[in-house]
Amino acid sequence: MNVRDNTLIVGSEIIETPPAIRSRYLETRLLAPVFMSYFQEGADWTTMPRPVLSDASFDLSYARDTESTLGGPTEPIEDPQASPFDVGLEMILDGAQCLRLGRDIVINVANQNHALAVEWLKRHLEPAYRIHVVHRMSDNHIDSMILALKPGVFLARHAGIQEMMPEPFNMWKFIVPPEPEPTSFPQYEDDDLVLTSPYIDLNVLSVSPERVLVNEACGGLIRELERNGFETVPVRHRHRRLFGGGFHCFTLDTVRAGDIEDYR
């Protein structure tokens, strides 16, 4: 359902990223007919090296640091098992770890798997695009940590995000909404699989420089966006913590209006 997670659209190129979650390994195959149609129209279609995803593939240091799992639940591999297919640490990265800002791409790196994947992307995309690394802004995805609402304006989880951003983007305006209200979420049992943090509603979708799709249950977020001059479109999505994503996650921007910008 969260089609943005394992795909990165850069210019006219579709890049399938190497997933970290074994159960999502073949997820982009469901999008193959869509990608094929764009390929036949002239788009480039690239797949990053696919990881084996044995226990030895993972850098476990971040998952073992339970105090730093900022993006949501992270499950450590408690007892790694050897496999005849082990190849050592592999490149692993989700498209949702990347924030595209014209010719600049900001990528969250929380472990060595991410760093290897970023090195591949640098060799593949530079110098046409500039790759910037932010360290451990989250465990992986950053689209409930920071989103670009329009050129010059970010929506951020907390004020400290600004210090993590590279120049010149740390000089943009950062809108920090109120903390999420516990009453805006359905109540779940202890054994329910809750996939996201309560900050998932920052995962809004900008459909124009002035208009933002936002969860109707988030009155504080809606008021803060409107106070900053945005038109909000409230949309109902009650069980976003179970579905593991918001409106930004649900969409993949294969078509955009306008030309690529350079904010340098």
Residue ranges and their predicted role:
Residues 1-264:
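The feature marks the mature, well-folded catalytic cores of soluble enzymes
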